Amino acid sequence: MNNEKNVSFEFIGSTDEVDEIKLLPCAWAGNVCGEKRAYCCSDPGRYCPWQVVCYESSEICSQKCGKMRMNVTKNTI
């Protein structure tokens, strides 16, 4: 048996063009969370320095990302 695990990432999109536009700022790092089929907020070190955060919907992502941006901006070293 081969112990290597094949990991493939897939960019998460939407069939709804309007939703796609709203989703882009949050999910440009979506390939990181492809296996979870979730929407990504950001790359580590951008708005979420400790991790990539994923949410189940673009609406939740937008809300959480907005709060995170403000929190991280206030605490910037």
Curated annotation (Swiss-Prot):
Pfam families: Ragweed_pollen (PF03913). Residues 1-22 form the signal peptide. Disulfide bonds join 26-61, 33-48, 40-54, 41-65. It comes from the Eukaryota. The keyword Signal applies. Keywords: Allergen, Disulfide bond, Signal. The keyword Signal applies. Transmembrane segments: none annotated. This is Pollen allergen Amb p 5a. It comes from Ambrosia psilostachya (Western ragweed). The lineage of its organism: Eukaryota, Viridiplantae, Streptophyta, Embryophyta, Tracheophyta.
